[in-house]
Amino acid sequence: MSRMTYFSADEVNEICDRMRSEHYPCDVIHLDTGWFRTDWLCEWKFNEERFPDPKGFIQRLKKNGYRVSLWQLPYVAENAEQIGEAKANDYIAPLTRQQDTDGSNFSALDYAGTIDFTYPKATEWYKGLLKQLLDVGVTCIKTDFGENIHMDAVYKGMKPELLNNLYALLYQKAAYEITKEVTGDGIVWARAAWAGCQRYPLHWGGDSCSSWDGMAGSLKGGLHFGLSGFAFWSHDVPGFHTLPNFMNSIVSDDVYMRWTQFGLFTSHILY
């Protein structure tokens, strides 16, 4: 169960308690972009005011039958806490020129740099960021993005033209390995993919439109994905964004019900 987005432990607990009281089957609660100090500012740390006791918060949810998944991405923002360390140690690939951005948060170009998974020290640094979260009880990391990188940058082990497609594989491998090391279960919640990513399940379609066309596209994409060797795949039910208002239009009951029926036949279902 997810939404865009939960902003506090109290909000999450209220939703989770209500699902149990109404006998709604759910075993994973996913926190998207709002669990940081600032929404979308990925620093791999809980907001201390809105989530004052992360370990206690997660333990309470586990006692209630929920595992916790957290959103993050493989880029470091200019105003992130880790930016100085990341730049000084080349954990993010140095840019050869400044790139234009529209400030949308939806592209690598909206961030100061891409974590360089061709550089073993950067990979271990990234794993350390995730380990701190897994150690307090987080079960799964959402490896969002990864489908594009900064192309005007110098990566330690590969030219960006070669790395661009392979990046998702290296990114998900790192998250999968540290998750399995800490929790014993190898799992991520990934969006991008390339040949070999089936070794690091699972993947979901990501951000489709809440419409009949959006549902049809998710079905067609998922069928092709399965034929490409991916045993596990999922999608947002009933889509992610709406029309004409991107986040605030009402999804029709017919689309909601039919998409739920479709979702039950995929390996994992995400509301």
Where are the regions that the model predicts?
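Catalytic-domain carbohydrate-binding cleft regions of carbohydrate-active enzymes
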Residues: 1-271
